[in-house]
C-alpha cells in the first residue's frame, strides 16, 4: 500500500525513482515470535490498554482527564503505555497523570521498550494515530477505540498526497470512533467494540493488505539484497 504514495511523492518532488520490493514486515515477524512465548494471564476483569502517540495530536493533550478519568474510573484493569517520545516531549503531562492516578489500584504504567507484553494482556486498545494500532490489530486481531478528531497533517508526507494515505483511510475501518460527547459511556462502548464482528472482519482485510509474507520478511529482504548485489556486480 505504500508504493502508491511513494510514487506520487517521487513525481511531485522530482526525485529519483526507487526500486521497490515488498518483503513483508520483519518488525511484526519478530513481535509475533515473542508473542508465542508469552503465557496468557487468567483475569476475570477485562484489560484496557491506553497507547497513544506523542505531541500536539496525541489523546493525552487533546482530551486529557476528560477521557482518561472515565476510563480509569470504570471496572477494568487499565494499562497506560505512553509513546517513548512522550517521556521527552510530553513529560509534563505524563507526570501530571502519574500523579493524578497514583492511588488507583487498577492502573498500571508501562514504560517497557518492547510493547508486546502489554499488547498481549489487552482485551481492547484505546489510541489515536499511533503505529501501535497496527501492531495490535495485526498480531491480535482485536479492535481499537479512537476518539474522534482531525489529524493535523502539517509537517508530514501525507499533506502532499492527493488521496488519503492508507493509514488514515484504514484506521476508521478497524476502530470504533468515540465521540467526545460520549466519553461517559466508555464502558458500554468498550463492550460493544470487543464483540463487533464487522471490526474484526475489517482488521483481517487490512492485515491482508498490509502484512504480506507473514514470517518471511527477513529471508525475503536478504534474498532481495543478494540479488541486487549480483546485478550490480555484473
Model-predicted regions and their roles:
Residues 14-17, 131-210:
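Catalytic binding pocket for nucleotide-activated donors in carbohydrate/polymer assembly enzymes
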Residues 1-4, 75, 121-122, 172:
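Short, well-ordered alpha-helix to beta-strand connector turns
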Residues 1-3, 82-87, 149-153:
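Short beta-alpha junction loops
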Residues 20-97, 176, 180-183, 194, ...:
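Conserved catalytic-core segment of nucleotide-activated headgroup transferases in glycan assembly
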Residues 92-134:
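Donor nucleotide-activated moiety binding/catalytic core segment of transferases
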Residues 9-12, 91-101, 162-164:
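Short, aromatic/basic amphipathic alpha-helical patches
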Residues 214-234:
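C-terminal alpha-helical cap of glycosyltransferases
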Residues 1-29:
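Active-site-proximal region of nucleotide-activated glycan assembly enzymes
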Amino acid at each position: 500500500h505504500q508504493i502508491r504514495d511513494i510514487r506520487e511523492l517521487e513525481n511531485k518532488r522530482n526525485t529519483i525513482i526507487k526500486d521497490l520490493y515488498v518483503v513483508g514486515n520483519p518488525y511484526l515477524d519478530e513481535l509475533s515470535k515473542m508473542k508465542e512465548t508469552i503465557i496468557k494471564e487468567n483475569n476475570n476483569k477485562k484489560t484496557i490498554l491506553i497507547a497513544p502517540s506523542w505531541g500536539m495530536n496525541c489523546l493525552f493533550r487533546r482530551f486529557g482527564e476528560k477521557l482518561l478519568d472515565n476510563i480509569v474510573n470504570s471496572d477494568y484493569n487499565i494499562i497506560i503505555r505512553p509513546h517513548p517520545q512522550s517521556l521527552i516531549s510530553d513529560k509534563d503531562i505524563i507526570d501530571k497523570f502519574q500523579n493524578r492516578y497514583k492511588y488507583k489500584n487498577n492502573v498500571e504504567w508501562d514504560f517497557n521498550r518492547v510493547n508486546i507484553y502489554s499488547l498481549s494482556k489487552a482485551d481492547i486498545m484505546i489510541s489515536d494515530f499511533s503505529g501501535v494500532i497496527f501492531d495490535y490489530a495485526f498480531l491480535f486481531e482485536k479492535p481499537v477505540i479512537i476518539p474522534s478528531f482531525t489529524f493535523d497533517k502539517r509537517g508530514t508526507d501525507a499533506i502532499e498526497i492527493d488521496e488519503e494515505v492508507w493509514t488514515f483511510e484504514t484506521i476508521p475501518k478497524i476502530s470504533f470512533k468515540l465521540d467526545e460527547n460520549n466519553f461517559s459511556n466508555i464502558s458500554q462502548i468498550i463492550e460493544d467494540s470487543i464483540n463487533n464482528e464487522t471490526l474484526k472482519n475489517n482488521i483481517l482485510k487490512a492485515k491482508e493488505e498490509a502484512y504480506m509474507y507473514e514470517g518471511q520478511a527477513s529471508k525475503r529482504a536478504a534474498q532481495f539484497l543478494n540479488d541486487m548485489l549480483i546485478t550490480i556486480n555484473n
